[in-house]
């Protein structure tokens, strides 16, 4: 049989392969963030253009098309550079399915643009089309967050996904408000949608704050205090408090767009910082893992392949099923050449146990989101509801029953086979 150190070396090599995959994924996530930001701006300008009947924002929209196209090309190159062999079978299947859907959406983007330029679409359908494309791109980020095996990296990915999701909802708010102002008249349905978008993005930012570091939380708090956000809050009140069918200032559409854009650009800065922290963490963990590997290989070369006098220590301290503790001064596994092979084995076991517990907590957030999304899908299929209406229905049920949203989602999924389908 191979020596114990040989197995530890194999484990470390697997860890390094996983960290390399995460480093590649973090680069993909960075590129997607830039493309999504460009598409969000393109959507807002498209709504300004459509709501004005083609009389406003054409030059800015065409310039944005060119900028977005550059980022589409970069993302396409990143997609093509993904290494299938580097991804475990189950995760790879999901990731590449997500990438395929996103690539399909990008391939028909020009067709959507042509309909917008011809004023053959309205603002609602256009916003929904861009939202589907952006959701497909963010799903790639979600898949990355759902597959990370390192707790610290997983936490950053969860924070990033929720922040990006909140930013997308803020982008939808920009587009919806631009169209509402440009239409020149308050509309009850559009006002209700704005309120839902504002509420939903705040929930995403709460999750971001839970999983991000203090420096990023401070940046987020500082963003709430800038002058542009105060102006945005004022324009929000105008949009939401104007009675339906009453006039709105058409000229305020540009002010609204600019205020939202200032906020979204600042949010993009936080997103970039979060992505940079993610990439730095990947590099840091990769360096540490390589150091560990070299340390283990050195010990193996020195012939430290057996437990020697420490052999019986495997059974020590096992009253109650506890694992023998490792001294706090042990530090990282690899470079500590004075430690026994026995300690190395238990250090590896203890590290894996701690990682497993922390990952369980991090992934609970992702699992809740999956359940809620599935429950929304059930409502959309059985009640013929839009995604927003399905989410509102779940929230109303949760409030009425005094339960958490995920508890209502679980109950609904359990009853799904018995739900009748309403005719279209």
Residue ranges and their predicted role:
Residues 1-315, 369:
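Hydrophobic alpha-helical segments
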Residues 88, 244-247, 324-325, 335, ...:
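Proline-rich intrinsically disordered, low-complexity coils
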């Amino acid at each position: 049989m191979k020596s114990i150190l040989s197995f530890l070396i194999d484990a470390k090599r697997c860890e390094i392969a996983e960290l390399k995959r995460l480093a590649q994924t973090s680069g993909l996530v960075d590129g997607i963030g830039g493309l999504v930001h460009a598409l969000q701006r393109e959507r807002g300008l498209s709504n300004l253009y459509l709501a004005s009947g083609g009389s406003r924002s054409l030059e800015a929209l065409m310039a944005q098309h060119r900028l977005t196209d550059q980022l589409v090309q970069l993302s396409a190159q990143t997609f093509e550079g993904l290494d299938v062999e580097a991804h475990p079978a189950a995760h790879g299947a999901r990731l590449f399915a997500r990438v395929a859907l996103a690539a399909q959406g990008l391939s028909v983007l020009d067709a959507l643009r042509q309909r917008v330029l011809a004023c053959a679409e309205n603002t609602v359908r256009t916003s929904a089309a861009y939202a589907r494309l952006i959701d497909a791109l963010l799903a790639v980020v979600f898949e990355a967050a759902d597959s990370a095996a390192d707790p610290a990296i997983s936490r950053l990915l969860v924070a990033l996904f929720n922040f990006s999701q909140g930013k997308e909802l803020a982008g939808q708010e920009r587009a919806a408000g631009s169209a509402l102002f440009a239409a020149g008249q308050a509309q009850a349905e559009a006002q209700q949608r704005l309120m839902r978008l504002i509420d939903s993005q705040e929930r995403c930012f709460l999750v971001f704050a839970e999983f991000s570091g203090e420096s990023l939380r401070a940046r987020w708090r500082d963003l709430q205090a800038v002058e542009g956000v105060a102006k945005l809050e004022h324009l929000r009140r105008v949009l939401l408090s104007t009675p339906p069918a009453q006039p709105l200032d058409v000229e305020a559409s540009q002010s609204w767009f600019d205020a939202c854009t200032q906020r979204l650009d600042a949010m993009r800065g936080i997103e970039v910082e979060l992505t940079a922290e993610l990439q730095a963490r990947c590099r840091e963990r990769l360096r540490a893992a390589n150091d560990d590997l070299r340390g283990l290989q050195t010990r193996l070369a020195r012939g430290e392949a057996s437990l020697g006098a420490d052999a019986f220590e495997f059974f020590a301290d096992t009253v109650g099923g506890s694992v023998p503790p490792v001294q706090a001064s042990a530090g990282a596994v690899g470079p500590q050449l004075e430690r026994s092979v026995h300690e190395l084995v238990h250090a590896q076991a203890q590290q894996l146990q701690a990682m497993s517990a922390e990952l369980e907590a991090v992934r609970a957030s992702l699992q809740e989101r999956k359940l809620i999304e599935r429950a929304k899908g059930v409502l959309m299929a059985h009640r013929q509801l839009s995604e927003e209406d399905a989410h509102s229905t779940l929230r109303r049920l949760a409030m009425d029953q005094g339960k958490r949203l995920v508890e209502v989602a679980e109950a609904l999924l359990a009853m799904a086979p018995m739900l009748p389908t309403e005719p279209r």
